[in-house]
Swiss-Prot record:
It comes from Burkholderia cenocepacia (strain HI2424). This is Probable malate:quinone oxidoreductase. One of its GO terms (molecular function) is L-malate dehydrogenase (quinone) activity. PANTHER family: L-2-HYDROXYGLUTARATE DEHYDROGENASE, MITOCHONDRIAL. Its cofactor is FAD. It comes from the Bacteria. It is an enzyme of class 1 (oxidoreductase). Coiled coil: none annotated.
Length: 553
């Protein structure tokens, strides 16, 4: 009897302990802060999505978590990217030559139309007072393509002629004349042999963009809203799904003795740049299993010598050397960062196993698993020329880099230039049922089937198209909301061209250029012939291109 009594007492103790655990767990769940949206990462993507959602659903609560001590300190930082407002005006890799010798401009049209959405989104934010002083983040900077050699000159002329079929590119000028090109870019022509066969295109509607400044202003605005909180120096350590379909996300405060913090979020966006893949994998969603990643860094030669800088106002893109992958395209760029004008030349590829400039050398190893190791190895075989190129880049000396600069700036002096390590880019490798693994172009939205969590992978064209990329994300994860009259009306108010193929309407192009140039305080747009019909196949999907063509350094 005593023995039975002891067993009962033991059971009571166990049950009491279990009840206490359940009660504690329930109390913990009840105490955990609830938010509608959690933004992981404090860069251009997360901040853009935050502003979009605040416009469309101002009553939603949002929390942003950033690992570093401030926002826009990684890839969005002005010193960690080339600051090109990518619109395919100058980048030759967006207009590949087909087997029949014709130039395919479908990708260029797609990129350009996306950038027009960004211009409209930024213009609206200026009108609302969210963004202030447009010259602090965007400035008119002509975009140029510059080539030499008979084959390259022939290609550039064909490219120019093909692009004239689209109203988006009709402000472009073409020249093979030494003196004309010297008027556009004196620094690139002085000291050059007049007999060298050169050609250039020039368009005044190009831009230089400080994505770090846009990010800081976006987050600065969001911080003034009562339902937004920002947590800096906060590293996400755990992402788990709750029974009700929400996500429990925990993070630790770095450089602090504060206890870990957590939220339960209805929707999680992982906009952590190079850190996004690891966090998507940590969430356990099956959609993340298809992806691996390969990090590529970039460095630039930089000068801030006023005598040099005043001679160049352009972003001048070249053509990859014979035998080199298209990602190796060098460019000589005017930059305006925090009010100071500088010139960058590059990029030169660098390698690190880090996925972020401020990341860990174990990033590559931590992201590799049984699901993606085979696709990654397959890409290494299929993209061997790319591997060779990267290996060659790592062996470059200071003299090699300076000699590359002199091909664009013949009178360059070594003492005027210094080498700057820019940011890391993580290129997507996706499992493929036929090839095993493929290197993916551009950026890719990875979302759970129910749309409760999503992340952005990839690099190019990246920040330039943050507004349309986040609009696409909302159409994917908030499909029902986007379809409502309220959201539709607001989206069209922010982006007047929403749902319109600008390529098919020269009048709409002029209207959009004029509106955004005025609000963003850019140079007046070029005049185009409204009577000339658009003959470009902008409605056709962009043709698949070699993946390395779109790799972003």
């Amino acid at each position: 009897m005593k023995k039975g009594s002891a067993v009962i007492k033991t059971l009571r103790v166990i049950l009491s302990a279990l009840a206490l655990c359940v009660a504690t767990s329930s109390a913990h769940a009840a105490d955990t802060k609830k938010v509608d949206v959690l933004l992981v990462g404090g860069g251009i993507m997360s901040s853009t999505l935050g502003v979009w959602l605040h416009e469309l659903q101002p009553n939603w609560s949002m929390t942003m978590v950033e690992r570093l001590d401030g926002v826009a300190l990684e890839s969005s930082n002005g010193w960690n990217n080339a600051g090109t407002g990518h619109s395919a005006l100058a980048e030759l890799n967006y207009t590949p030559e087909k087997a029949d010798g014709k130039v395919d401009i479908s990708k260029a049209i797609e990129i350009n139309e996306s950038f027009q959405i960004s211009r409209q989104f930024w213009a609206w934010q200026v009108k609302q007072g969210v963004l202030k002083n447009p010259h602090s983040f965007i400035n008119s900077t002509p975009h140029m393509s510059f080539v030499w050699g008979d084959d390259n000159v022939r290609f550039l002329k064909k490219r120019y002629e093909a692009l004239q079929a689209s109203p988006l590119f009709r402000g472009m000028q073409y020249s093979e004349d030494y003196d004309q090109i010297k008027q556009w870019v004196p620094l690139m022509m002085e000291g050059r042999d007049r007999n060298q066969k050169v050609a250039a295109t020039w368009t005044p509607i190009g831009t230089d963009v400080n994505f770090g400044e846009i990010t800081r202003q976006f987050v600065g605005y969001l911080k003034t809203q009562p339902n937004f909180t920002l947590s800096l120096s906060s590293e996400v350590r755990e992402i788990t799904r709750n029974a009700d379909g929400t996500w429990h996300v925990s993070w630790v405060k770095l450089h602090s003795d504060e206890p870990p913090q957590s939220v339960d979020a209805k929707f999680v966006f992982i906009g952590a740049g190079g850190g996004a893949l690891h966090l998507l994998q940590a969430s356990g969603i099956p959609e993340a299993k298809d992806y691996g990643a390969f990090p590529v860094g970039g460095s630039f030669l930089v000068t801030d010598n006023p005598e040099v800088v005043k001679q160049h106002l352009a972003k001048a893109y070249g053509k990859a050397s014979v035998g080199s992958p298209p990602m190796s395209v060098p460019h000589l760029d005017t930059r305006i960062i925090d009010g100071k004008k500088i010139i960058l030349f590059g990029p030169f590829a660098t390698f690190s196993t880090k996925f972020l400039k401020n990341g860990s050398y174990f990033d590559l190893a931590k992201s590799t698993n049984l699901h993606n190791v085979a696709p990654m190895m397959r890409v290494g075989v299929d993209e061997f020329p790319l591997v060779q190129y990267l290996a060659g880049q790592l062996m470059l000396t200071d003299d090699d880099r300076f000699n590359a600069l002199k091909e664009y700036f013949p009178n360059a002096k070594k003492e005027d230039w210094r080498l700057w390590q820019a940011g890391q880019r993580v290129q997507i490798i996706k499992r493929d049922p036929v090839k095993g693994g493929v290197l993916k172009l551009g950026t890719e939205i990875v979302a759970s089937q129910d749309g409760s969590i999503a992340g952005l992978l990839g690099a190019s064209p990246g920040a330039s198209t943050a507004a349309p990329i986040m609009l696409n994300l909302m159409q994917k994860v908030f499909k029902d909301k986007v379809a409502t009259p309220e959201w539709q009306q607001k989206i069209r108010q922010i982006v007047p061209s929403y749902g319109t193929k600008l390529n098919d309407s020269p009048a709409k192009v002029v209207e959009e250029w004029t509106y955004t140039s005025d609000v963003l305080q850019l140079s007046p747009p070029p005049k185009i012939d409204l009577g000339a019909p658009s003959q470009a196949t902008g409605n056709a999907p962009a043709r698949p291109a070699k993946a390395s063509a779109d790799m972003a350094l």
